[in-house]
């Protein structure tokens, strides 16, 4: 068997990626989230496939087909809730994975980091086009409001919105194409994941110390396969507790009402994992400015390698930058909370302050802190 996995053309690829891969001996549990994301992706593709067998992308039957899945299909309710809450688990793992990359300086592996940003954007696009599919009140109005933001683009905005909608409002054409996009995008994500891993295995993984670990590597199997299996077990436990005890805690009650274009919900909001970006969008009174801030709130990740002036990799030995990082995380939680609140005082003011702080920490304070730390440690 050993000879076969090292010689066979296909098994050799698996061997170099999962078995004999040299990995740093000191990587912590924060490095588990890559494998957890892979498991989440597999869960989403499998449950999504079974849901697609029973779902109909037509405005007259979409809502009833979801009800039919939950009531009449064997374990349809379970598949649906695993898919819905699996998306939340996916984004929790994704945010932690990106946060770990920022904390430990993994953004210095440029190709891996940039492919990761493309993956993040593609995952967000996949989650967004899925929101309209149940054809509930919030999903309909959420899709209408967010797609309508493209009308802020000068000259071509209105035409672009009508082109995406396939008409003059979110209707059958929009639902059909969004379902098609939602079906194909996870497979594109899978292909991008392979590219992400390809670039990662070219350079080797980063580690908590931020130092070169070539002199101290261990094989991925059995050490990290066992560690990843424990992570997967915990993930599945949390997911099943969510699915079986609190299936609707992260959803919106308005989605249990069929979409009605004549009746607008009191507070239109997207899914919880988009709320931080939605809060940034709402905090700018100008429509185009808000859309640009929304896009920049994600694309700012691409600036981390450019803005990094520290002589050390990661924040583990940099107390000033460490404090700023945790303020940044706390600020993200505040933005997520604000995104779910109505547009009124004091929420608008808190949102504006948090949005300014979000960009200030990344663009001004963290580079300044790096330079101060270089001076203190005499790293000229």
From Swiss-Prot:
Parts of the chain that traverse the membrane: 33-53, 77-98, 113-133, 178-198, 226-246, 288-308, 320-340, 347-367
Obligatory cofactor(s): heme b
Co-factor binding comment: Binds 2 heme b groups non-covalently.
One GO MF term attached to the UniProt entry: metal ion binding
Function: Component of the ubiquinol-cytochrome c reductase complex (complex III or cytochrome b-c1 complex) that is part of the mitochondrial respiratory chain. The b-c1 complex mediates electron transfer from ubiquinol to cytochrome c. Contributes to the generation of a proton gradient across the mitochondrial membrane that is then used for ATP synthesis.
Remaining remarks: Heme 1 (or BL or b562) is low-potential and absorbs at about 562 nm, and heme 2 (or BH or b566) is high-potential and absorbs at about 566 nm.
PANTHER family assigned: CYTOCHROME B
Protein name: Cytochrome b
Gene that specifies this protein: MT-CYB
């Amino acid at each position: 068997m050993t000879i076969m996995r090292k010689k066979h053309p296909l098994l050799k690829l698996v061997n170099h990626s999962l078995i004999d891969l040299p990995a740093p001996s000191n990587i912590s549990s924060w490095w588990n989230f890559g494998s957890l994301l892979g498991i989440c992706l597999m869960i989403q593709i499998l449950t999504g496939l079974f849901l697609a067998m029973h779902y109909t992308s037509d405005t007259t039957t979409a809502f009833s087909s979801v009800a039919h899945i939950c009531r009449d299909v064997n374990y349809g309710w379970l598949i649906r809730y695993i898919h819905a809450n699996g998306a939340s688990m996916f984004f929790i793992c994704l945010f932690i994975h990106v946060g770990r990359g920022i904390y430990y300086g993994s953004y210095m592996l440029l190709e891996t980091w940039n492919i990761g940003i493309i993956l993040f954007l593609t995952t967000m696009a996949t989650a967004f086009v899925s929101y309209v599919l149940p054809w509930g009140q919030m999903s309909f109005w959420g899709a209408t409001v967010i797609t309508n933001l493209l009308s802020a683009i000068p000259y071509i905005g209105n035409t672009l919105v009508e082109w995406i909608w396939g008409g003059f409002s979110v209707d059958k054409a929009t639902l059909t194409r969004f379902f098609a996009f939602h079906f194909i995008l996870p497979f594109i994500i899978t292909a991008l994941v392979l590219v992400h891993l390809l670039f990662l295995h070219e350079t080797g993984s980063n580690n908590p110390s931020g130092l070169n670990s070539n002199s101290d590597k261990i094989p991925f199997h059995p050490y990290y396969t066992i560690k990843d299996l424990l992570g997967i077990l915990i993930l599945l436990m949390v997911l099943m507790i969510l699915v079986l005890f609190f299936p609707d805690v992260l959803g919106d009650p308005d989605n249990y009402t069929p979409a009605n274009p004549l009746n607008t919900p009191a507070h239109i909001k997207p899914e919880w994992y988009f709320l931080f970006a939605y809060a940034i969008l709402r905090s700018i009174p100008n429509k185009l400015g808000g859309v640009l801030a929304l896009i920049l709130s994600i694309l700012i990740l691409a600036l981390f390698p450019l803005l990094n002036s520290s002589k050390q990799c990661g924040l583990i030995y940099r107390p000033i930058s460490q404090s700023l990082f945790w303020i940044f995380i706390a600020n993200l939680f505040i933005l997520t909370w604000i995104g779910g609140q109505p547009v009124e005082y004091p929420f608008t003011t808190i949102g504006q302050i948090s949005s300014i702080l979000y960009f200030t920490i990344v663009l001004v304070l963290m580079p300044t802190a790096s330079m101060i730390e270089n001076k203190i440690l005499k790293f000229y």
